[in-house]
From Swiss-Prot:
Function, as annotated: Binds directly to 23S ribosomal RNA and is necessary for the in vitro assembly process of the 50S ribosomal subunit. It is not involved in the protein synthesizing functions of that subunit.
Stored InterPro entries: Ribosomal_bL20, RIBOSOMAL_L20_CS, Ribosomal_protein_bL20_C
Keyword line: Ribonucleoprotein, Ribosomal protein, RNA-binding, rRNA-binding
Signal peptide stretch: none
Organism from which the protein derives: Mesomycoplasma hyopneumoniae (strain J / ATCC 25934 / NCTC 10110)
CDD domains, sorted: Ribosomal_L20 (cd07026)
The protein's name in its UniProt record: Large ribosomal subunit protein bL20
Amino acid sequence: MRVKGGSITRQRRRRWLKLAKGYWGHKSIGFKTAKQAVVKSWTYAFRDRKQRKRDFRKLWISRINAAARNQGISYSQLMHKIKQSNIEINRKMLAEMAIHHQSDFENIVKLAIAKSA
């Protein structure tokens, strides 16, 4: 006896269409294109979770560089002096200090220059 499996097929398709809700055009109503769009979005999500880490690191470096140049030192020289003087602070915190706590950032720059000299 043949089993048609219509309800299971509908459930499976409904699940994919639910994942594609909000997509533009036929990607939200056509099963095949919806499935392709969802799989592609997962690919982008996986890739961009890695990319986000690189983007934030670039942002922190550019912010630290801008603040460091106001103090008369380049980013690379500052990081070298911080490492030489055994100041354990990461780029995220340095960038945060450079924007919101300028006086503390200036103190770290002065300390790094003084200790490494």
